[in-house]
């Protein structure tokens, strides 16, 4: 019996030894992005799946672009969810048959109320935005800079430190909004509202 216990302890110790070695290797290869924007306390640079373990800057920039875009969309989604939960709706009808915006329920239930053609229009519009509008056509100042020499809102009047601070704030708020909209959707499916009545 003692042999079985000893053998199981030895096997479990051997099982975890390579994982520690792998973690050291992963940290060493990710040092290239340790000082990038978004590598902030308490986590620092966080890449648990090793997506940029090879140190590829182009791949990192693409993932950062996607993170910023999804963060911006999630911020709009959280704001839209809160607006709808407070009973604020667009005036008029969503289709020619007289279905008013007021009659459409919030959240996932809206998908069963809107016609297939309406959902197809929404998907087509999002596809149009993705392929034609939401593009960085000028090679902006940073990844995710969609000003395209058209919209500025005073961005160029800030010093470099303020710009970095504002970009870090946007990145963190986008990350929080992604978790926030996910939490709202999960709680909706669980039948629990996070919004006080």
Swiss-Prot record:
The chain crosses the membrane at residues 73-94, 114-134, 174-196. It is a multi-pass membrane protein. GO terms for cellular component: chloroplast thylakoid membrane; light-harvesting complex; photosystem II. Pfam families: Chloroa_b-bind. InterPro entries: Chloro_AB-bd_pln, Chloroa_b-bind. Keywords: Chlorophyll, Chloroplast, Chromophore, Light-harvesting polypeptide, Membrane, Photosynthesis, Photosystem II, Plastid, Thylakoid, Transit peptide, Transmembrane, Transmembrane helix. GO terms for biological process: photosynthesis, light harvesting. GO terms for molecular function: chlorophyll binding. Residues 1-31 form a transit peptide. Its main location: plastid. It comes from the Eukaryota. Disulfide bonds: none annotated. It is found in: Plastid, Chloroplast thylakoid membrane. Belongs to the fucoxanthin chlorophyll protein family. The light-harvesting complex (LHC) functions as a light receptor, it captures and delivers excitation energy to photosystems with which it is closely associated. Energy is transferred from the carotenoid and chlorophyll C (or B) to chlorophyll A and the photosynthetic reaction centers where it is used to synthesize ATP and reducing power. The LHC complex of chromophytic algae is composed of fucoxanthin, chlorophyll A and C bound non-covalently by fucoxanthin chlorophyll proteins (FCPs). The ratio of the pigments in LHC; fucoxanthin: chlorophyll C: chlorophyll A; (0.6-1): (0.1-0.3): (1). This is Fucoxanthin-chlorophyll a-c binding protein E, chloroplastic. The lineage of its organism: Eukaryota, Sar, Stramenopiles, Ochrophyta, Bacillariophyta. The gene is FCPE.
């Amino acid at each position: 019996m003692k042999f079985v216990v000893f053998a199981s302890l030895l096997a479990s110790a051997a099982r975890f030894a390579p994982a520690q070695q792998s973690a050291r290797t992963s940290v060493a290869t990710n040092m290239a992005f340790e000082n990038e924007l978004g590598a902030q306390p308490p986590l620092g640079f966080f890449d648990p799946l090793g997506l940029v373990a090879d140190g590829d800057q182009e791949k990192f920039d693409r993932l950062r672009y996607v993170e910023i875009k999804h963060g911006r969309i999630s911020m709009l989604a959280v704001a839209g969810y809160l607006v709808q939960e407070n009973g604020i709706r667009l005036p008029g009808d969503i289709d020619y048959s007289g279905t008013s915006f007021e009659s459409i329920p919030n959240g996932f239930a809206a998908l069963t109320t809107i016609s297939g053609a309406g959902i197809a229009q929404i998907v087509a519009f999002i596809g149009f935005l993705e392929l034609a509008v939401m593009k960085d056509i000028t090679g902006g100042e940073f990844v995710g800079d969609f000003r395209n020499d058209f919209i500025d809102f005073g961005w160029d009047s800030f010093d470099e430190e303020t710009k970095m601070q504002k970009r870090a704030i946007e990145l963190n708020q986008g990350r929080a909004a992604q978790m926030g909209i996910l939490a709202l959707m999960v709680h909706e499916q669980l039948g629990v509202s996070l919004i006080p009545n």
